[in-house]
Amino acid sequence: MSLFKILVAAATVATALAAPHEHKKPHPSYGDANAQCGNHQKLSCCNRGDSGGVLDGLLGGNCQPINILALLPIQNQCTNQVACCTGNSNGLINIPCTNVNL
């Protein structure tokens, strides 16, 4: 009976040690952020507006494309909100930029 307990304990420890751990990068690169953008979207830096709301800075008027090397940390190039923008502002209801979660 004690051999069974030892085997169960060893299997439990081995399973816990083999569990994958997620390691987040402290400073995501341009390439990491750009990977969240879809087709025909450009990674952009959006200035914060005065409204303070959910759509603050994401309506496209204050966004500038980021053209930078893929290896550099994105915080070095954009200290405001990073977003994926289509550059298209045609239509009745249109939000040309979406937030990038870093």
UniProtKB/Swiss-Prot annotation:
UniProt cross-references to Pfam families, sorted A to Z: Hydrophobin
Keyword entries, A-Z: Cell wall, Disulfide bond, Secreted, Signal, Virulence
Signal sequence, start to end: 1-18
Cellular localisation: Secreted; Secreted, Cell wall
The keyword Disulfide bond belongs to this UniProt entry's keyword annotation: yes
GO cellular component, one term: extracellular region
The protein, known as: Class I hydrophobin 1
Organism expressing this protein natively: Metarhizium robertsii (strain ARSEF 23 / ATCC MYA-3075) (Metarhizium anisopliae (strain ARSEF 23))
